[in-house]
Amino acid sequence: MIQKSQTRRGGFTLVEIMIVVAIIALLAAIAVPNFLRARKRSQATRVLEDLRLIDAAVDQYAIETNRTTGYQVQWDDVKRYLKVGSKLYNSTHADILGGDFGATFSVDTLPAVPTSTYTSLSDVAPAEFWSPFRTP
């Protein structure tokens, strides 16, 4: 008489593996768009902070050199009041997305959000987000 082996082989069935893959795909479909949105929002926050730093640097330059409203401050003058080694200091008056802040800034006038940056981040940062800075 032939005996069947009673030992059962361990492992996962194809159906079990497919269910796990489907669950992982579902979680990824939910998480990835949220991650990308959060990343863009953090980029917008970084640009906003750079605008604040530029405005403060222009004000500091104007105070130390007795400049009045409307005086045009050059990037090299602003740069002296930024933290040495920072990305903004090392840039050629550009934000992290490559948008140009401009080479000159006017005393007592807030700097503007670069047009290309405003356009690329408009889905996560509407006009109110950029207040009080000028938008295109």
Regions found by a protein language model. Name each.
Residues M18-N34:
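Alpha-helical hydrophobic helix detector
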Residues A56-D59, I63-P136:
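Extracellular/periplasmic head regions of type IV pilus-like filament subunits
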Residues M1-F12:
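N-terminal leader/signal peptides at the extreme start of proteins
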Residues L36-L51:
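Aliphatic-rich helix starts adjacent to a transmembrane/signal segment
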